[in-house]
Amino acid sequence: MKKYNVLGIGNAVVDVISQSSDSFLNKMNIEKGIMQLVDRERGELLYNSMGNRNQAPGGSVANTIAGVGALGLKTGFIGKVGNDELGAFYRNAMEENGTDFVNESIDQSDLPTSRSMIFVSDDGERSICLLYTSDAADDEDSVD
């Protein structure tokens, strides 16, 4: 069993950031300047419509753990990601930044990784559409 100075349990959410015009926001019916939850169908439509996107692992616990790890402590994170491209990205990015991703991806191949789609307007305003698809490690089977 590995030992950590700090181990966090939280929601694994990929932050996906893209520059977007006001006309794009209007066309996609995204209300400017707010955060809104979206269902899976709308979330996948919005994600696929994002051009030139940047991605980063996110979620408040994961961000905190990454910061602690940057100070030199041994860190681990427990959270659920889908068995998909974004899940692999999340896991790899956390580990490349020095934080162990402790648990396995969820087996349900049809459940995608959670994502926060951040549309940044020309004036710097952020409009966020959040697709939550999996909770943090919410049962004893999630952790060895």
Positions of predicted regions on the chain:
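Glycine-rich phosphate/adenosyl-contacting loop at the front of the ribokinase-like
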Residues: 1-78, 88
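Single conserved hydrophobic/aromatic residue that forms the stacking wall/gate
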Residues: 132-144
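Short, basic and Ser/Thr-rich N-terminal targeting/leader segments
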Residues: 71, 111-114
